[in-house]
């Protein structure tokens, strides 16, 4: 094959708009269906959907974390208490005074 002919065929191949076709179609459909039967993906999806539906029926679908912005937020001192925060301050002050840290 001459140099000119090789260059023309390479140009034709690389300028293709559509990807090369698989001779017998894609194996994804059978592979995906096989995988879902092995892993139980469809059963898990059905369980999740029914769980969401039951939680939505009681009104807790949004969960406790998604509170409106107008709700009161808890201060850090309410979580830890005054004793734990003062101990931390003393510990850090002590290490700085000893020259360690």
Curated annotation (Swiss-Prot):
Start-end of Low complexity biased regions: 45-60
Keywords, alphabetical: Activator, DNA-binding, Transcription, Transcription regulation
DNA-binding region: 55-74
GO molecular function terms attached to this record: DNA binding
Domain of life the protein comes from: Bacteria
Region of interest: Disordered: 1-26, 45-101
Biased composition (Basic residues): 1-10
Function of the protein: Increases the production of several extracellular enzymes, like alkaline phosphatase, amylase, protease or lipase. When present in high concentrations, delays the production of pigments and sporulation.
Name of this chain's protein: Secreted enzymes activator
Record organism: Streptomyces griseus
Biological classification of the source: Bacteria, Bacillati, Actinomycetota, Actinomycetes, Kitasatosporales
């Amino acid at each position: 094959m001459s140099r000119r002919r090789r260059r023309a065929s390479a140009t034709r191949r690389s300028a293709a708009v559509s990807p090369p076709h698989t001779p017998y179609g894609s194996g994804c459909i059978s592979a995906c269906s096989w995988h879902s039967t092995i892993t139980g993906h469809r059963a898990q999806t059905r369980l999740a959907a029914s769980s969401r539906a039951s939680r939505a029926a009681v009104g807790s679908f949004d969960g406790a974390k998604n509170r409106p912005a107008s709700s009161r937020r808890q201060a850090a001192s309410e979580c830890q208490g005054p004793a734990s925060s003062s101990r931390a301050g003393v510990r850090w002050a002590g290490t700085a005074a000893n020259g360690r840290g």
